[in-house]
Curated annotation (Swiss-Prot):
It comes from Schizosaccharomyces pombe (strain 972 / ATCC 24843). One of its GO terms (cellular component) is nucleus. This is UPF0390 protein C24B10.18. It comes from the Eukaryota. The lineage of its organism: Eukaryota, Fungi, Dikarya, Ascomycota, Taphrinomycotina. Residues 19-31 have a biased composition (Basic residues). Residues 1-32 are annotated as: Disordered. Belongs to the UPF0390 family.
Amino acid sequence: MAQGEFKKKKNSSANKGGRVTKHSKNPKKGARYCAPRRAAAIKDHTINANITKTLNVRNEKLIAGIASQQVGKLTITKALGEAGAKELKEGKH
């Protein structure tokens, strides 16, 4: 027969806390991005980024052109904004 009592294990939940850092409390939102390590992948990524940029610029110019044809010159000034606000208050619009 063994002599002495068994050593009791400490409660494992007491050790789980550990250090709570600022980053672990509030992680950043959004997708994570890992840069490619191969030269071909880097080249493809830059080409895709340039294509996306040119398409966005082209679409914005197209939409601005269509809007200016329908409405006229697109300008926002303080005087026009105040005049529009007066018309809305008076109900002329």
